[in-house]
């Protein structure tokens, strides 16, 4: 029962995080992350480590892109991570559509906070 409650709590954290991200409320998103979070840099490649690096990455991203991510479905993986199927739409600052696709975000939690995230093609899921 406690495990089910933990999963429900983690999914609620992720739902709030997606809503905050789409509002560009970076500080609210960062509050759901572990201090040394490991995050993918989907724009430039590689990964960023720690909240301040994630903050800097998103500031750079929001200067040139207008991403929107809408969670559609969540599942618990065998290793305990949570996979979220996400509809991702990205425009450039002039409004030109760059990306409209389904992807999957896979989260690992530690101490009730997001420890890491990876991005997968839905076909890999």
PLM ranges: what are they?
Residues 38-48, 60-64, 120:
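A short gly/proline-enriched turn/hairpin at secondary-structure junctions
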Residues 1-32, 36, 113, 125:
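Short, low-complexity N-terminal intrinsically disordered segments enriched in polar/charged residues
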Residues 24-27, 40-45, 91-94:
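Short, charged low-complexity linear motifs
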Residues 1-9, 55-125:
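A beta-strand edge to alpha-helix "cap/lid" segment located at domain peripheries
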């Amino acid at each position: 029962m406690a495990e089910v409650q933990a999963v429900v709590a983690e999914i609620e954290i992720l739902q709030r995080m997606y809503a905050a991200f789409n509002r560009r409320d970076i500080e609210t998103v960062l509050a759901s992350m572990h201090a040394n979070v490991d995050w993918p840099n989907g724009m430039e490649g590689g990964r960023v480590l720690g909240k301040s690096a994630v903050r800097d990455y998103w500031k750079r991203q929001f200067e040139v892109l207008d991403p929107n991510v809408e969670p559609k479905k969540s599942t618990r993986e065998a290793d305990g991570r949570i996979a979220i199927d996400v509809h991702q739409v990205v425009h450039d600052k002039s409004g030109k559509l760059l990306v409209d696709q389904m992807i999957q975000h896979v989260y690992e939690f530690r101490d009730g906070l997001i420890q890491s995230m990876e991005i997968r093609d839905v076909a890999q899921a």
